[in-house]
Amino acid sequence: SLDGEDTSGWNAENWRKRRTKLQAVFQDASGTLNPMRSVRSNVEEAMVNLTCLSKRQRRERIGELMELTHMEERLLDVPARQLSGGEQRRLSLVRAMSIRPKYLVLDEVLSGLDLISADAVMRVLEQYHREFDCAFLLITHDMDSAYRLSDTILTMQAGQIVRVGIKQ
């Protein structure tokens, strides 16, 4: 369910209408980015399609999110294909957060990042949660990051929930 609505019978149109509430960031960020487009264009595309912000408001929000994710402004006009893996992952986060969703699905977003980059991404997520009251569904094998970012942790095995824990 999403906001109390049963989603089991939803078609593509139902999901499309609710994309502003729910966004996802995947382990392979390059799959959600257009490698030929600039960083700015990749983010603005989502904002144009899913928000009613003016061009000025979009530019301001992109600047704020670039700063929040510690991405240099000079990267705005660089094609996404020229970014490192960590930068692509952060750009994917910027893109998802740019429309201010209520829910973020984070699929192995820390996987493959060095410790410094992973910590930076976790700090971004913690700050974003505090500022915008966004809930996360964090899919990870890293129990330390799960504990750091989660209130409730479900442990799954073979597709089944085997344990539920609430952080105290």
Language model region names:
Residues 100:
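Conserved catalytic motifs of ABC-family nucleotide-binding domains
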Residues 140-141:
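H-loop/switch region of ABC-family ATPase nucleotide-binding domains
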